[in-house]
Every structure is written in C-alpha cells, then in structure tokens.
C-alpha cells in the first residue's frame, strides 16, 4: 500500500503517469499539512495572518509488492520538477494485510 502526500498542482501529472504504468485505482483526498515547508504569511484587509497548514493531496494506492518500486519511481518522476524542492511531498509504504472486493467477495491480489 502506498500513501503519497503531494502538491495539488501535481495531481493530474501523477494520475496520468500512473495510468501509463497501468495503475488505475487511486483514492485522492484533499488534506492540509506542513513539514519542513512550514506555512507562510498572508495579508488580509491590512492584517497579517500566518497560514500554518498548506493544501496537499493524499493519494492511497493499493498495489502488489512487485509494483511498489515502479509506482514510487513514477510518483517521484511526476512530482520532482526542476531538481526538487522542499514541499514536493512524501511517499509512505506499508504492508497491505488483506483486500476484499465487496461486490464479488474476491480477496488478495484478485481484489486489486
């Protein structure tokens, strides 16, 4: 299982790149967060506000163990532009214990 947190502007390029390697099942959620990128200061009606949490997109991709490296390389390639910079995102890989396709009852890799 891969969970990637990326910049919203990279979502379409990641989706297209994943489709090119036959990964078509992705869950995308709009989230907010910060890491080393931190927040930024904005002006609104003359007053300064610190925006700590920045908009991000969290992708969840259920794949087989054999697909992990290729999916990671694909996401990095679609998100790392101009040599990469703070805020490009992170990728987390976890073990997927079980998958069940609700409609058919299929389990394991057949359910992916």
Region locations from a protein language model:
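Positively charged, small/polar-rich N-terminal and surface patches that mediate targeting and assembly
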Residues: 1-112
């Amino acid at each position: 299982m891969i969970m990637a947190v990326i910049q919203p502007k990279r979502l379409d390029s990641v989706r297209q790149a994943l489709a090119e390697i036959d990964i078509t099942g992705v869950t995308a959620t709009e989230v907010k967060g910060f890491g080393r990128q931190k927040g930024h200061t904005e002006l609104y009606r003359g007053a300064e506000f610190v925006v700590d949490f920045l908009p991000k997109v969290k992708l969840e991709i259920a794949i087989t163990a054999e697909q992990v490296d290729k999916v990671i390389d694909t996401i990095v390639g679609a998100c790392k532009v101009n040599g990469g910079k703070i805020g490009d995102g992170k990728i987390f890989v976890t073990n997927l214990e079980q998958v069940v396709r609700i409609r058919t009852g299929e389990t394991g890799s057949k359910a992916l």
